[in-house]
């Protein structure tokens, strides 16, 4: 066991709402009792406005930035690759024909003409994704004519208009000495007491922690050389964090002074641009990358490899596609922690917080209350410190900053997932008996959390605060 004395969300919150127009033969608003709106495929007639969604609950309290004529198309699970290839070939051919009919006065032409050099190249399929065969689809720009045809193909599960995801700064320039102390103690700290973080020596060793965010300053000295770049998903972006959000989250997961899992390997997967903005499809591609990397690491049977975790401190309004991508990654063995959001509303109304197989994290305060901004509800699984959290930042090799948000709470849980995975016997040990699945570890983490201590929670929100065991024997955990 070790302890460290601690020196005295930015939730990637989109603040969006899905504006869902009627679209001839494709979607129709259905008003729900709770005031949300649903849309169904293949119903209704209406005037075109770029937007074709199929989802169960589209929250309309935020302002959504949807991308005109750009869509995420998801296949049914039970179709073959041959069917997928045939469908995509037909779509691309038909789209080229459709584009050839356009004039310079058409809205589709105006929307995307700045990004291509000739009319024959306008739009069409630009990305295919496949998360371990469990979640497959593609993205692209399509005309009204073609998106209607796509939506009516029986092998298509649903079509969702591409939307943006963003981060929303909520920084506080104050010392924040309490977060690590709280997750390693059952009792809340008292004002003025000495604070310490209690943990086992392994502390994430053998585990790879992926941070899907704005990138990471891998040269920051507090990462001790354990941070590296994995992928840059947004087109024409670079392997650097010019925002700071990703570096801060990574520090909470695994940096020397501010991290929960101080020996974990940290991998940057840039899904948000340096300005803090991104798209649902880029997040999905990032999840696909993480899943493939995890599967490859598992196949190598490295005796030191103990598993993969991932953190998503970002969000948008409801996106069934993004939540399905997360669930597919979890089913493939990746342990996910996700920020609940900062709107002081039901977390089930946003994505990916509503993904059922990940761990969705709300933010708590020093006094063990729900943070005033933290989302709540049945989609929240557990709470973690999210007010005035000190961590690594950009600007110099030893820069730090104190931030608040569910973005800061979620990495505490990602770090604890990495921490517990590292405490398992090595794969080549006689005591090794299969690493816990994400579902098994989720159940153990939630059961082991500190129960019933949080205030201002609400009747339908789990009253659970994350806990790492305090460096003690964990017989009660396993």
From Swiss-Prot:
It holds the Pfam family Inhibitor_I9. It is an enzyme of class 3 (hydrolase). It comes from the Eukaryota. This is Subtilisin-like protease 3. GO terms for biological process: protein catabolic process in the vacuole; proteolysis. Serine protease with unknown substrate. It comes from Saccharomyces cerevisiae (strain ATCC 204508 / S288c) (Baker's yeast). GO terms for cellular component: endoplasmic reticulum; extracellular space; fungal-type vacuole lumen. Its EC number is 3.4.21.-. Gene3D superfamilies: Peptidase S8/S53 domain. The active site is at residues 213, 245, 407. The keyword ATP-binding does not apply. One of its GO terms (molecular function) is serine-type endopeptidase activity. Keywords: Hydrolase, Protease, Serine protease, Signal. Residues 70-167 form the Inhibitor I9 domain. Residues 177-478 form the Peptidase S8 domain. Residues 1-17 form the signal peptide. The gene is YSP3. Belongs to the peptidase S8 family. Induction: Undergoes rapid but transient induction upon transfer to sporulation medium. PANTHER family: CEREVISIN-RELATED, PEPTIDASE S8.
